[in-house]
């Protein structure tokens, strides 16, 4: 039987291609769509959004709704990156990882 992750943390960024130099409107809309997902915590950073959930499916849903949002805004090409840290041995939140790194 597969072990269920205690918490999954992911770094996600999305970039509409061909929409000009500033993409803040599109990124803001994507973040708004992510904020509606129950059971998903997020932290916006200057270069990406960090996602946290005990359910990997919620993180993948955030990617899906972000792409759908940008398509609705007229983006004809979308590039995104997703880096996932799924820890199974003990619970670690975004805040725990930051505290650990700072010492």
What are these regions (language model features)?
Residues 2-103:
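Charge-rich, low-complexity N-terminal segments
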């Amino acid at each position: 039987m597969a072990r269920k992750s205690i918490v999954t943390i992911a770094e996600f960024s999305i970039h509409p291609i061909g929409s000009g130099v500033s993409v803040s409107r599109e990124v803001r809309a994507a973040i708004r769509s992510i904020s509606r997902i129950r059971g998903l915590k997020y932290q916006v950073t200057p270069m990406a959004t960090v996602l946290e959930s005990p359910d990997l499916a919620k993180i993948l849903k955030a990617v899906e709704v972000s792409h759908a949002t940008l398509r609705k805004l007229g983006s004809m090409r979308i590039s995104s990156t997703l880096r996932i840290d799924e820890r199974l041995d003990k619970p670690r939140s975004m805040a725990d990882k930051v505290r650990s790194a700072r010492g």
